[in-house]
């Protein structure tokens, strides 16, 4: 090797290799041992866990990178956050955070000595202990890595608007085969070195997944190099299996990469260079299960898929495996690494950074510590003047867009708010954001482009996965964000939502040192009832059903019926912490029902009787309760009420509108739930309830099944009927229209029985006219198009 490739002195090389051995020893101990952590006595059955869980294969590589990043931090005084894409290598991160002293500060019972080491080993993947992955309980983690694909987008999200932060992102070669990860490579086209930090991707090629080779490990060097160049990176290769050689190569490569990062940032921040740079990245090829047993039961282990999880698992009852484990553990020579009391030797402790520079204690990984309140204008100032219900038409998102625009403006200096979306910001009627900012764009630009800028704060890439990953990384490191998306296509990130909801559940309820972060706010529009022009593929309101499966401590669902209520809900969501808020509202021109103060009162309650639409106030109990949730169901309900007033003026109708869907659940099930007495007072205990709902109707039954009057509840909603047709035909196809609602009342209100036949005939006639009209003219009937609440 030349001098340029050997930056480590013999002494430093020995120390770094020893530190790596210590991390590997602790990792194996976590997987296998529950006692005898320093092997002071011969290994026996009582020392071995009864159930061996964990993943060894990726772990030594993660440990190797950690010690090298520690060297970079010490030498350059950098802030680096470690993101482990192969989060199943949980033992590695736990081991390193313990070695640097952070773990014992967060968990004093896991002390920095032999007793603490024993507890460290015993607790791993053990009942009452810690999970097997880089879970929220791991200091320094913002990425559990259980579900693969999101490491790189999380890394970029973390460094946006964090100019002094570097995210070292380890990408497993299995993870690199996922769709989200493949797209996330393009995040470098959105990273501005002047105002953002940097990401150092490390593609860890250990060759195998659970039982198969990985694609990127089996293509040629040239093909892989060209792939990374094509993504816009400058790849460096560190490949081999000899530890001493690999340490020198990795140290030299990391020095070069961090030199290049510093130069890229200097040129952007000092020289004013604006073109997109080629950011460095590392391809790190090492054996799977490196330093582990080479052969188990006559079959290859190290460098094979067989080392992916536990290389051998019958230790307690297999003397050969017991001896193999003991030999493996002793190969790390723990007596050279720890004192007799289990304390890491002082010269090895010196390799770790100090204080908040430690990757396990970096404040960015506990974003709530850094979170600052958004500066926000009074949302009431953006409201629509509604003199009377149904007297004004408007596109609900537009006032919200002006509100978001000014939030962007007021927080320009703090640089802690961004809006995310898959190429839909303008389509979703949020275009007024562009009066204040632009779309972030570091790739090539043409004179004809619209609102592209190196300094934009609207993040658009046609990948819901990448948008979600960016936003999660941004929130987890202490900032605020807003995600707008077509309702049907938010399903693309169903699983990412799952993982973030799980993270919030654990951090909020089980880990007191994790400070609350800003909520993840979804605005879903272009929704099912106004996707008549795009057709069946764009018609799906089921994300709500998916969301409500999660813990009530985490999720909130809002269905504001008009623009002023949308403003009120948005204001509330942006101020909230540790939630996932889902807001669903249409973007097409629609009637406005509530003045601003009425909207605020209604949204604060989450549910309420609309007295102006009801006629039962002084008449005792109503004959029927007509409930609605969602803007189009609200419109159809009010249209049905107007028809019923004409056909059955004596009918006492109570109109209930639901903004906060979780109010329907009992108070014991959700903190927003109505008490049973309040629910019964509003919905009665024995009168028919006709409920027009935005989504799949059975969700309402599920939320209300414990309520007294559930047996009288009849729900209309989306029944998976759709095509390219007219807006009103969409609700007719799903029997959510005003005419079907009128028929439902006629069928269920006993006092209407004498005239029910006439009412239902009226309904049938109108539905026939509707179908004939749209077939002939291609648009809805004038009485539908021109309908208004006002007389």
Curated annotation (Swiss-Prot):
Protein's UniProt keywords contain Cell division: no
Q: Which GO terms describe its biological process?
A: carbohydrate metabolic process
**Pfam families attached to this UniProt entry:** XFP, XFP_C, XFP_N
Which PROSITE patterns did the record assign? PHOSPHOKETOLASE_1, PHOSPHOKETOLASE_2
Q: Which Gene3D superfamilies match?
A: 3.40.50.920, 3.40.50.970
Required cofactor(s): thiamine diphosphate
The superkingdom of the source organism is Bacteria
**Which GO MF terms are attached to this record?**
aldehyde-lyase activity
Q: What is its EC number?
A: 4.1.2.-
Q: Which UniProt keywords apply?
A: Lyase, Thiamine pyrophosphate
InterPro entries in UniProt: Phosphoketolase (IPR023962), THDP-binding (IPR029061), Transketo_C/PFOR_II (IPR009014), Xul5P/Fru6P_PKetolase (IPR005593), Xul5P/Fru6P_PKetolase_C (IPR018969), Xul5P/Fru6P_PKetolase_CS (IPR019790), Xul5P/Fru6P_PKetolase_N (IPR018970), Xul5P/Fru6P_PKetolase_ThDP_BS (IPR019789)
Its family remark reads: Belongs to the XFP family.
What name goes with this protein?
Answer: Probable phosphoketolase
Originating species: Chlorobaculum tepidum (strain ATCC 49652 / DSM 12025 / NBRC 103806 / TLS)
